Amino acid sequence: MIRVTCLGGTGTVTGSSFLIESSQGKKVLVDCGLFQGGKQIEERNWQDWGFDPKQIQTLFLTHAHIDHSGKIPKLVKDGFQGRIITSPPTAELCTIMLMDAAHIQEMDAEWQTRKNKRQSHGELSLIHI
């Protein structure tokens, strides 16, 4: 038997991610997308996964769009060590897009940290690729 859990891309058009679990204990994640939109939607990027990333054997990436690939750095940071299956063009594009997204997030975090310090809220932590 196979169980499919929709983790994103439902109720919103971003954050595409589906967990497929077999009765033999195999776990495959299809896409690992970033939630985009308003503040309330984007806060979902920092919520608990609902599964242990260390237990995922394979990430199957359908394409490079950030709403399908943007949380890969967080997945790795949180313990994913499995293989990633995707097409060569998607792998190439993801390398470029995720590095660019990391740079933008660093700039956003620096701005937010300066703002937080002025308001006594402290620094933000980044997920490094």
Spans of features found by a protein language model:
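Residue-level marker for the onset of beta-strands and adjacent loop->beta junctions
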Residues: 14-16
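Pre-active-site segment of Zn-dependent metallo-hydrolases
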Residues: 12, 22-61, 65-82, 86, ...
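Short Gly/Pro-enriched turn/cap motifs at secondary-structure boundaries
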Residues: 8-10
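Extreme N-terminal starter segment of soluble prokaryotic enzymes
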Residues: 1-3
